[in-house]
Design a protein with these regions (language model features):
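Short, surface-exposed helix-loop/turn micro-motifs enriched in polar/charged residues
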Residues: 55-58, 125, 199, 287
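Short Gly/Pro-enriched turn/cap motifs at secondary-structure boundaries
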Residues: 29-30, 160-163, 264-267
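Aromatic-rich carbohydrate-recognition surfaces in CAZymes
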Residues: 1-89, 97-115, 119
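Generic structural "secondary-structure junction" signal
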Residues: 7, 13, 18, 57, ...
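Active-site catalytic pocket residues across diverse enzymes, especially alpha/beta-hydrolases
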Residues: 47, 211, 280
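A generic structural signal for residues located within well-ordered alpha-helices
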Residues: 35, 166, 203, 268-271
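Non-catalytic C-terminal accessory modules of carbohydrate-active enzymes
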Residues: 131, 218-353
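Catalytic cores of carbohydrate-active enzymes
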Residues: 12, 71-90, 97-257, 346
Length: 353
């Protein structure tokens, strides 16, 4: 959420640095395998957004140390497995975790990609990483793909061939599958009420990002109202660690075997901040450091839009009211996409269409 609220990078740099710690690496971030992969992926996303190569030069040895730790604990197929001290988390959901987990492998695949891209940015040889990217994709498709279900199963060791949403969501977000398959995932998995629902604001963000990426903005807007809004209607003033709309009363507050063990102020629930800026206001960098960026608003159900979105080291202001769209920014390199047409955005000159 920090990068979605402020163009000041110092907080993000401090956060990334603190999460890596200092080598040697002896355990995953928070002991959670997924968080280690996500930190490496997030480091690339920070660089792509800011172009801050000096920070990448500084943090790369720590990223490489964490990456090497991840790789050292893979199995003979190059898959993430739970080693002593590990926590294969992904989400608080009914996932078959009895063996290697598909969603975890897709995160690893993207971490391989991120290391390749970071290494290339520093002028290094990315071959070892790109080879792992290709090899892992083949293994995932061989072991986790179920042609009859047209889905990635949670794991292949139990015989259950259980399908949850998580692998499909990551596959959509990281372009692990083509558009046709992604659309099938929406129809057969994400819109399928027989597939276990997500019950954390944390992972609900990823699901809504997948919907938005494929053009289903209204679904995401309705979910913001019903899911995050559901907590507010129950009296929440901050967002909870977990929320299951089917629960009632004090059951909402129980977690970790404790009747009142749930965090009711959890930063991982801040996903709408990103969703609204990225997909409704439609602001995104299209090249490293946001030297080029697009503004492609998608109001969906909203009649008006007013927002300021960080991009690069500055901001883009987007206002939609009474059918008039206005974009302002102190940056060069912007393009407005609106009603199928593209308009160059001039630095410091309001553009109204």
């Amino acid at each position: 959420p920090n990068a979605s609220l402020s163009a000041a990078g110092a907080l993000n740099r401090r956060t990334i640095t603190a999460l890596y710690g200092k080598p040697p690496v002896i355990e995953h971030v928070n002991r959670i395998n997924d968080y280690s992969a996500l930190l490496i992926i997030g480091t690339w996303e920070y660089y792509f957004t800011t172009g801050d190569i000096d920070f990448i030069k500084f943090i790369y040895p720590r990223a490489k140390a964490l990456y090497d730790f991840i790789v050292s604990r893979l199995d003979e197929n190059g898959l993430v497995v739970g080693r002593p001290g590990d926590w294969i988390f992904i989400d608080w959901s009914d996932i078959d975790k009895s063996g290697p987990l598909a969603a975890e492998q897709i995160l690893l695949w993207q971490a391989h990609n991120a290391m390749a891209w970071l290494t290339e940015a520093l002028g290094g040889d990315q071959k070892v990483y790109t080879e792992r990217v290709d090899r892992l994709k083949a293994v995932i498709n061989e072991k986790f793909w179920d042609e009859e279900k047209r889905a990635y199963i949670d794991t292949y060791t139990s015989g259950r061939r259980n399908v949850t949403r998580h692998a499909a969501i990551f596959a959509i977000l990281y372009d692990f599958v083509d558009r046709e398959t992604a659309d099938d995932f929406v129809k057969n998995i994400l819109e399928n009420d027989n597939i276990t629902k997500i019950t954390t604001p944390y992972f609900e963000l990823y699901e809504l990002m997948a919907f938005c990426k494929l053009g289903h903005i209204e679904y995401a807007q309705n979910m913001i109202d019903s899911y995050w809004g559901g907590m507010l209607k129950l009296g929440a003033t901050t967002i909870w660690e977990q929320y299951d709309p089917t629960e009632s009363g004090v059951a909402h507050y129980g977690m970790y075997g404790n009747k009142f063990g749930k965090s009711l102020c959890h930063a991982w629930g801040s996903g709408p901040i990103y969703l609204l800026g990225r997909y409704c206001l439609g602001v995104r960098p299209t090249s490293v450091g946001a030297k080029n960026f697009k503004v492609e608003p998608n109001p969906g159900l909203y009649k008006e839009l007013h927002g300021r979105v960080p991009v690069g080291n500055a901001y883009v202001d987007v206002d939609l009211e009474d059918g008039k769209l206005t974009v302002r920014t102190p940056l060069d390199g912007g393009t407005l996409v609106w009603n199928g047409k593209e308009y160059p955005i001039e630095k410091d000159v309001p553009l109204t269409v």
